[in-house]
C-alpha cells in the first residue's frame, strides 16, 4: 500500500544535503567546475577524479527529479519476493541492510518507490555530470 513509504527522498533532515540545503552531488559538481575554471590557464596536464556518492543509499534526490517518474508506471521485477529467500538460513531476519531501508516484508509499492528514488538520483547525478562536461567544453 502507499502507506508503507516511510520517508521522502528530498527530506533534508535525513542527510545527503549540506546544511545550506544543497545536494551533495551539486556541491561536488560545483567544486569540480570551480577547480577546472581556476586551472584553465595552467600549462600542466589536468587530472581530476570526481567521485559521486550517488546513486548509493540513502536514495535522496531533489523532489523535482523524483516527480519526473510516475511511481504507478514503474514496473516490479518478475522475480519480486516480499522476503529474502535465504533469510531463515542466514538467520538475519530484519537485520539485513536492505531490510532496514524499506518496509518488511516488501510490497510491490515499496519496490516501485525504491526504483523511483533510484531513477531520480541517477537523473540528478547525470545532470551534474552534464554541467561538468559543459564546463570542460567552455574551459578547454
Model-derived features: positions:
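Active-site-proximal cap/lid insertion segments
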Residues: 1-140
Amino acid at each position: 500500500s502507499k502507506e508503507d513509504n516511510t520517508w521522502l527522498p528530498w527530506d533534508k533532515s535525513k542527510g545527503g544535503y549540506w546544511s545550506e540545503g544543497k545536494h551533495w552531488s551539486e556541491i561536488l559538481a560545483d567544486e569540480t567546475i570551480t577547480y577546472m575554471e581556476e586551472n584553465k590557464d595552467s600549462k600542466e596536464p589536468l587530472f581530476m577524479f570526481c567521485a559521486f556518492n550517488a546513486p548509493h543509499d540513502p536514495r535522496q534526490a531533489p523532489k523535482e527529479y523524483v516527480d519526473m517518474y510516475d511511481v504507478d508506471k514503474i514496473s516490479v521485477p518478475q522475480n519480486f519476493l516480499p522476503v529474502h529467500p535465504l533469510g531463515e538460513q542466514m538467520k538475519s531476519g530484519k537485520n539485513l541492510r536492505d531490510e532496514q531501508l524499506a518496509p518488511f516484508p516488501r510490497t510491490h509499492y515499496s519496490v516501485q518507490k525504491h526504483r523511483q528514488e533510484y531513477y531520480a538520483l541517477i537523473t540528478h547525478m547525470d545532470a551534474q555530470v552534464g554541467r561538468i562536461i559543459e564546463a570542460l567544453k567552455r574551459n578547454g
